[in-house]
């Protein structure tokens, strides 16, 4: 948020980090997919359901990406029908017209239908879309593409050779992966389109690009430290972010503490404070860190999750924060000792999630749509860009014969995090820790153990320990003088209004020190 010199809000913008696209395809057990799908199924009027090919749908259980987790209702008891109305109001507020809102909903419903598609395999191993599946017709209608183009984009891979385009048929497993890539890319582009529209609605129309001299406030909302029964690439990125911001929090607390002591002229030797730089090096150090090893493996044509795991075990074996036992090696797992505790990760799908390959056919398919809104999503994917480490813009895409290979997700995330930390270092940050009172998401229930664990993970308990070792009681001079001057009445000047509050405090402290030195030990105890 940017403000004028008089404090008036000038404009605002939002930025996203690490969209969890894997949730769209495979939400975890006990977790829901993105709320939008449930809200549409619960809230769309009957007259509109037919337009979105939902006329015969009973509910979330009819669509694979919603049924796979077995969880349909929100744990907090909020009704999807009500939040659907809130959603429509929000879309209108940020500038979506009625037609655009329908097109947005149409894309979401297309993803539901795509999740129900299936493939058949011929005797030669070539795949084809199962045309007997009723979801196919609905998906084609909602996406505005032809059956021929749709089938070719999912079941074939285009190869350019000497100016000629050849098509290679894909296996059923490869076609399924292509469908998942199409769904994730479409959802990602839709998400980015909404973000772009929000930024357009909250930016000042005549705002210049140069905001030098603006007063600004940034609000960073991030996931807390994560440790589940199964932890994957997303948890590594989230915990990497938390490690980096925790280090910044530690340094800021020390810096602020030291500045205050120096300002007051207080001599105090700082106690040791856990430094997690070694964890950050383990994750991001060039050529040696886990993300760097992952990027190197992604460049090897025949790499697998197993080959990545072996390379990581070899390079990280001696790192004090890295551990792996024989049974974990069999599974491709490893452990990192984070500042908040030890977390075990599985390397399964690490390569795929980090590579984030976008089949060239996907962008071409969306761009060929007869529906302008969906064609615009293809354009967003084709022109996707990311910031380079030096702050300049460069294309985040490089072409191969059959796909657009983005800068790896890990590299993009590291760059975003580096830029974010640079911004924070130029500000005066204020930290707000949000704590869950219980794991059941129910009101009126407070679990001290859960709260204590969150405070420990967030580094709050450690910060309190540092404060206690120093001078935890911090009275303003005026408050201290008012409260304790009665102990030094004989020493307080009659015309004390001519003395500063700090001078009065010194008089009180010196008088009490003299009183303690001159009094018998038992008298001091009695006082």
Regions found by a protein language model. Name each.
Residues 1-28, 33-42, 140-141, 149, ...:
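Extended, low-complexity interaction tracts enriched in P/G/S/Q
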Residues 1-87, 118-120:
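Microtubule-binding structural modules
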Residues 30, 80, 101, 129-132, ...:
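Generic alpha-helical segment signature
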Residues 45, 109-116, 147, 227, ...:
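Short alpha-helix boundary/capping elements
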Residues 75-78, 127, 236:
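Alpha-helix capping and helix-loop boundary segments enriched in small/acidic/polar residues
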Residues 89-144, 166:
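Folded alpha-helical bundle/alpha-solenoid domain cores of large eukaryotic adaptor/scaffold proteins
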Residues 103, 208-215:
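Short basic/glycine-enriched coil/helix segment immediately N-terminal to the Walker B
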């Amino acid at each position: 948020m940017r403000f004028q010199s008089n404090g008036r809000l000038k404009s605002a913008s939002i930025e996203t980090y690490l969209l969890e696209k894997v949730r769209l395809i495979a939400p975890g057990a006990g977790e829901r997919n993105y709320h939008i799908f449930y809200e549409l199924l619960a809230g769309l009027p009957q007259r509109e359901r037919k337009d979105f090919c939902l006329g015969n749908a009973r509910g979330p259980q009819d669509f694979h990406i919603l049924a796979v987790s077995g969880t349909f209702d929100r744990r907090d008891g909020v009704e999807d029908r009500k939040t659907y109305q809130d959603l429509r109001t929000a879309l209108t507020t940020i500038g979506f017209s009625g037609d655009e809102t329908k097109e947005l909903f149409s894309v979401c419903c297309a993803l539901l239908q795509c999740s129900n598609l299936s493939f058949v395999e011929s005797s030669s191993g070539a795949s084809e879309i199962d045309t007997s599946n009723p979801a196919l017709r609905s998906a084609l209608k909602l996406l505005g593409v032809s059956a021929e183009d749709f089938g070719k984009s999912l079941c074939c891979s285009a190869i350019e050779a000497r100016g000629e385009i050849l098509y290679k048929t894909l296996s059923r497993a490869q076609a399924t992966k292509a469908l998942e890539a199409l769904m994730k890319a479409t959802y990602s582009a839709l998400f980015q389109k909404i973000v772009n529209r929000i930024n357009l609605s909250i930016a000042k129309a005549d705002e210049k690009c140069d905001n030098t001299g603006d007063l600004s406030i940034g609000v960073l909302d991030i996931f807390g430290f994560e440790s589940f029964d199964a932890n994957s690439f997303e948890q590594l990125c989230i915990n990497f972010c938390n490690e980096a911001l925790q280090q910044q929090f530690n340094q800021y607390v020390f810096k602020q503490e030291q500045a205050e002591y120096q300002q007051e002229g207080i001599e105090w030797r700082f106690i040791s404070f856990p430094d997690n730089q070694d964890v950050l090096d383990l994750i991001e150090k060039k050529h040696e860190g886990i993300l760097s090893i992952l990027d190197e493996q992604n460049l090897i044509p025949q790499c697998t999750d197993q080959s990545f795991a072996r390379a990581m075990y070899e390079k990280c074996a001696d790192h004090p924060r890295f551990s792996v036992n024989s049974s974990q090696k069999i599974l491709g797992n490893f452990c990192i000792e984070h500042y908040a505790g030890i977390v075990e990760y599985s390397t399964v799908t690490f390569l795929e999630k980090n590579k984030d390959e976008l089949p060239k056919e996907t962008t071409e398919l969306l761009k060929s749509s007869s529906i302008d809104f969906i064609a615009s999503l293809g354009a967003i994917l084709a022109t996707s860009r990311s910031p380079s480490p030096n702050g300049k813009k460069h294309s985040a895409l490089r072409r191969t014969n059959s796909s657009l290979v983005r800068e790896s997700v890990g590299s993009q995330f590291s760059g975003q995090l580096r830029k974010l930390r640079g911004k924070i270092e130029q500000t005066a940050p204020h930290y707000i820790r949000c704590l869950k009172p219980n794991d059941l998401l129910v009101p009126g229930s407070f679990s001290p153990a859960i709260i204590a664990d969150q405070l420990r993970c967030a580094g709050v308990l450690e910060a309190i320990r540092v404060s206690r070792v120093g001078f935890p009681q911090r009275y303003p001079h005026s408050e201290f003088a008012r409260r304790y001057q009665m102990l030094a009445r004989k020493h307080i000047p009659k015309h004390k209004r001519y003395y500063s509050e700090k001078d009065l405090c010194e008089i009180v402290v010196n008088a009490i020190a003299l009183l303690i030195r001159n009094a018998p030990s038992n008298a001091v105890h009695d006082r």
